[in-house]
């Protein structure tokens, strides 16, 4: 499904940014790297995402007049093909503009019980207690558990399977983050700015980065752990543990040096310190990992992951670098 050869993008973006997302605004962090006059990148320490209404305007300003920004988010962008077929959805992005409105008004409201689940209200459950993924499978008319997943959600040689989009319980669930990201940020931005582009739905990455504006991509920091050779990917390690984050400091600093990425003094200090012991440490860590993983792709150290399957390109979406 992927390109077999990694190569740098022909026109690297002026700005690369990655947001570690959460339903809690206080747990959202964004890391950025700016392209310098000599063509190298300088990476900055993560900051709070802050206000959503002007986020893309701030990215445009940082990229400069006529510049391009590549923005990564670690929530799903796309729908499982079985659900799309049942809901008669042919393209994800045009549908995303409509979700939460009209006949899709209840889309973002997680079903309180199995009887409320439908193709137009697929997120479940609203709260724990007597809930099963089988309820989703049955109510959506799916053939089995595999139909809850997009192809890019399936396990790879570097990680286990991602959580299915519509499931909203548990530490690994992504449903609530997708609701927040789509409803509160991406969909409103698409409705107000048709020039906003989402990879891979709106074209190949290299082609989109050759044009001014903002390109959005889905990322998965847990996948990037393996791309960057981090020990935190090992089963007995956790990003929640500051000591485990510190254990990978040397590997992150070495990766940046090998790829001629300049790090701000604050980012260097944060990496060495494992991003501190505060509750936002894991968020700032993953924001940085996401940024480095995106740089890895842009610089040609990792395949972009251009999917060949037309259903993936129209409906399911893909994870950058997979």
PLM segments and residue spans:
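RNase H-like (RuvC/DEDD) metal-dependent nuclease/polynucleotide-processing core
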Residues: 2-17, 21-322
């Amino acid at each position: 499904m992927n390109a077999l050869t990694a190569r740098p993008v022909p026109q690297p973006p002026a700005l690369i940014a990655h947001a570690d997302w959460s339903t809690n605004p206080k747990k959202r962090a964004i890391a950025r790297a700016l392209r310098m006059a000599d063509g190298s990148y300088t990476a900055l320490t993560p900051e709070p995402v802050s206000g959503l209404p002007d986020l893309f305007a701030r990215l445009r300003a940082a990229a400069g007049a006529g510049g391009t920004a590549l923005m990564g988010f670690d929530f799903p962008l796309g729908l499982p093909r079985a659900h799309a077929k049942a809901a008669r959805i042919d393209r994800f992005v045009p549908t995303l503009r409509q979700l939460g409105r009209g006949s899709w008004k209840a889309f973002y409201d997680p079903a309180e019980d199995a009887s409320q689940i439908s193709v137009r209200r697929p997120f479940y459950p609203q709260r724990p207690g007597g809930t099963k993924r089988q309820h989703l499978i049955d109510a959506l008319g799916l053939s089995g558990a595999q139909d809850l997943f997009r192809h890019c959600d399936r396990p790879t040689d570097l990680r286990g399977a991602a959580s299915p989009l519509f499931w909203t319980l548990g530490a690994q669930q992504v449903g609530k983050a997708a609701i927040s990201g789509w409803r509160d940020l991406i969909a409103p931005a698409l409705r107000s700015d048709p020039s906003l582009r989402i990879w891979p739905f709106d074209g190949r990455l290299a082609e989109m980065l050759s044009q001014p504006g903002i390109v959005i991509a889905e990322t998965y920091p847990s996948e990037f752990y393996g791309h960057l050779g981090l020990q935190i990917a090992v089963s007995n390690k956790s990003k929640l543990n500051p000591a485990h984050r510190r254990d990978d400091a040397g590997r992150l600093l070495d990766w940046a040096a090998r790829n001629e990425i300049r790090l701000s003094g604050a980012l260097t200090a944060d990496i060495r310190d494992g991003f501190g012991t505060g509750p936002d440490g894991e968020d700032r860590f993953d924001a940085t990992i996401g940024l480095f993983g995106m740089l890895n792709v842009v610089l040609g150290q990792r395949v972009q992951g251009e999917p060949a399957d037309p259903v993936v390109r129209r409906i399911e979406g893909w994870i950058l670098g997979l």
